[in-house]
């Protein structure tokens, strides 16, 4: 959030804020600023009207996340600093454009700007929403992203991801960031930037935390645990009813077996064994169906938060 005397701007940050507040951090192992835009791709003689996720980022992105390069390599710091139009594309995009992954040195046109492909990476799962993209390019190549800012050049289009050397460094990183924020705010006349609870971890995000509000683990376990127990109660009651119905149908059989010397413990163990087998078979069938349906439904199930 950026506050001024005229109001506040709650959203992403500018390239200047990325540089002054985050690139100057010394405790994290790697820092990366990025912005995402949905744009069509084209090559000479072929235009693709479908929107692809273009990730505008820096060289730190390749340190924060581990990509498998099939050919080529990521753009360099020199490319980034000079605004050289280099691009890393995903395997599926390379095949869509040229029918092969051997496309290093070939061109791709993004928003009327021609980029040279410097690397091809294995497709990234949509579940990895921050790392996911179709094309990755230096954000210094996009003039609009670099200049379209507000609130004394504090607010813009960018987000940040950090890689800590150790989980014990989280608090130290937050304290170091507060010092950088104080220094940066001192450079401005009126505007003041504030990141609230940020940076937050992937675990924090998974339990529902956002930049303005951090969810406590105890509260999450209490709320989510209560909901899960309620949801599990329904199938548990159904299973109990099925078991009781099966026992009622076999009362005569159990009476005969008990008359021939079967103990109560033997009868109970048999019932538990039979129901466990049925439950196991049902679980395996459900797992198999999930594995079969996931490739078909992955586009709708794993939509990126950026789209």
Model-derived features with residue positions:
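Active-site acidic-Proline motif in GNAT/NAT acetyltransferases
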Residues: 166-167, 249, 275
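Hydrophobic alpha-helical transmembrane segments of multi-pass inner-membrane transport and secretion
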Residues: 1, 215-252, 280
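Membrane-helix entry/capping segments
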Residues: 183-227, 249, 294-307
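Structured, solvent-exposed hinge/loop segments at the ends of secondary-structure elements
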Residues: 1-97, 101-102, 109-115, 175
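Transmembrane alpha-helical interface segments in multi-pass membrane proteins
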Residues: 253-298
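Mid-to-C-terminal secondary-structure elements
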Residues: 60-74, 85-213
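Conserved beta-strand->loop/alpha-helix structural units within folded catalytic cores of enzymes
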Residues: 108, 237-238, 274
């Amino acid at each position: 959030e950026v506050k001024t005397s005229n109001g506040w701007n709650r959203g992403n940050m500018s390239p200047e804020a990325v540089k002054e507040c985050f690139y100057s951090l010394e405790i994290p192992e790697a820092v990366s600023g990025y912005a995402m835009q949905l744009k069509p791709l084209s090559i000479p003689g072929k235009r693709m009207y479908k929107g692809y996720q273009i990730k505008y980022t820096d060289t730190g992105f390749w340190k924060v996340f581990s990509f498998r390069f099939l050919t080529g390599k990521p753009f360099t710091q020199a490319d980034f600093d000079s605004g050289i139009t280099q691009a890393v594309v995903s395997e599926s995009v390379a095949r869509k454009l040229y029918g092969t992954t051997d496309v290093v040195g070939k061109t791709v046109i993004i928003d009327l700007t021609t980029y040279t492909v410097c690397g091809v990476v294995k497709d990234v799962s949509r579940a990895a929403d921050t790392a996911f993209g179709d094309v990755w390019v230096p954000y210094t190549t996009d003039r609009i992203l670099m200049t379209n800012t507000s609130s004394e050049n504090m607010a813009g289009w960018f987000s940040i991801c950090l890689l800590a050397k150790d989980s014990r460094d989280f608090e130290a990183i937050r304290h170091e960031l507060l010092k950088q924020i104080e220094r940066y705010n001192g450079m401005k006349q009126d505007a003041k930037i504030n990141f609230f609870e940020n940076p937050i971890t992937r675990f924090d995000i998974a339990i529902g935390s956002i930049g303005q509000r951090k969810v406590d683990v105890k509260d999450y376990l209490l709320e989510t645990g209560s909901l899960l127990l309620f949801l599990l109660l329904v199938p548990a009651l159904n299973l109990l009813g099925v078991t009781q119905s099966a026992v009622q149908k076999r009362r005569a059989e159990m009476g005969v077996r008990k008359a021939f010397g079967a103990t109560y413990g033997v009868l109970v163990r048999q019932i538990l064994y039979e129901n466990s087998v049925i439950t196991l078979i049902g679980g395996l069938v459900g797992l198999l169906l999930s594995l079969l349906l996931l490739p078909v439904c992955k586009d709708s199930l794993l939509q990126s938060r950026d789209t």
